[in-house]
């Protein structure tokens, strides 16, 4: 195995692989064409800072390894599982395909799940609760799995995440288990925009987190917004940190102290004046 290949396998995780894959398989067909392979490998190597002068040589080596060790269909289609098995560790491979079975749309949905299982706000869920969590997750997606499959999923998750064997999983563990789309807030650059652009962006942001369409953020909607805000500056956050920041946000923005953040209250917090 060449150095570039070893480097990517050592550092590539399921989320990163999926982000790159989606650029080429926008329709989620589960395969890319052989003609797209060079560009896919280019993106993969660029992610890990492989020098341009070495790019062509490494891409060629990777293609040769793929052709030798994996099946390519007569139509020139390369399945995602072929490339994933080539670049991801066993654990990350498992996570990738589990996530495809149980996708989530946004951080609000994620936080609804987290709050249900971290009912005491300890910042952890017990490994014993993991089995119930996984069963509910499949039911949420209208998928029924056998007890044997559930036991296998639970056992693998514990092996991957409960490394210190304390029987607990934290917020970051759950975030890795679940397939969250890229942080919604990353697409906005509030500081670099005109007032009108900021207002327009604010409308999109509020609409995204106001899942219940009540005109106010409450419960997991506030949690989801807080989680995405924090992850802009701190990629790895704990449940305890999230609760602290949530409390600070409510203290500053919840003017009428009803436990919710009205649209006008959030706008005021962000220094915006919007039409009522």
UniProtKB/Swiss-Prot annotation:
The UniProt entry, under Pfam families, shows: EF-hand_5, EF-hand_7
Residues binding Ca(2+) 1 are 118, 120, 122, 129
Organism of this sequence: Rattus norvegicus (Rat)
Q: What induces it?
A: Down-regulated in cultured insuloma cells after dexamethasone treatment.
Membrane topology classification: Peripheral membrane protein
Q: Which GO terms describe its cellular component?
A: cytosol; dendrite; extracellular region; nucleus; synapse; terminal bouton; transport vesicle membrane
Q: Which Gene3D superfamilies match?
A: EF-hand
Which parts of the sequence bind Ca(2+) 4? 254, 256, 258, 260, 265
Q: Which SUPFAM superfamilies match?
A: EF-hand
The name under which this protein is listed is Secretagogin
């Amino acid at each position: 195995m060449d150095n570039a290949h070893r480097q990517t396998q050592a550092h590539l995780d399921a989320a990163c692989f999926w982000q790159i894959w989606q650029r080429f398989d926008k329709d989620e067909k589960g395969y890319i064409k052989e003609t797209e392979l060079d560009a896919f490998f280019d993106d993969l190597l660029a992610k890990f800072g492989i020098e341009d002068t070495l790019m062509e040589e490494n891409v060629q080596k990777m293609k040769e390894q793929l052709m030798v060790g994996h099946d390519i269909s007569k139509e020139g289609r390369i399945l995602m599982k072929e490339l994933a098995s080539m670049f991801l560790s066993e654990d990350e491979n498992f996570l990738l395909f589990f996530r495809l079975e149980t996708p989530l749309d946004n951080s609000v949905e994620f936080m609804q799940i987290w709050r249900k299982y971290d009912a005491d706000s300890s910042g952890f869920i017990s490994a014993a609760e993991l089995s119930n969590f996984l069963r509910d997750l499949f039911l949420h997606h209208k998928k029924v799995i056998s007890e044997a499959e559930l036991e296998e999923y639970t056992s693998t998750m514990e092996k991957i995440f409960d490394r210190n064997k304390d029987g607990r999983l934290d917020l970051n563990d759950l975030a890795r288990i679940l397939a969250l789309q890229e942080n919604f807030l990353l697409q906005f650059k509030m500081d670099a925009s005109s007032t009108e652009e900021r207002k327009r962006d604010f409308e999109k942001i509020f609409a995204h987190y106001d899942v219940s369409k009540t005109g106010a953020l409450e419960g997991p909607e506030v949690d989801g917004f807080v989680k995405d805000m924090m992850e802009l500056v701190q990629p790895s956050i704990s449940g305890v940190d999230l609760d602290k920041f949530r409390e600070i946000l409510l203290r500053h923005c919840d003017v009428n102290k009803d436990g919710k953040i009205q649209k006008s209250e959030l706008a005021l917090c962000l220094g915006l004046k919007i039409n009522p």
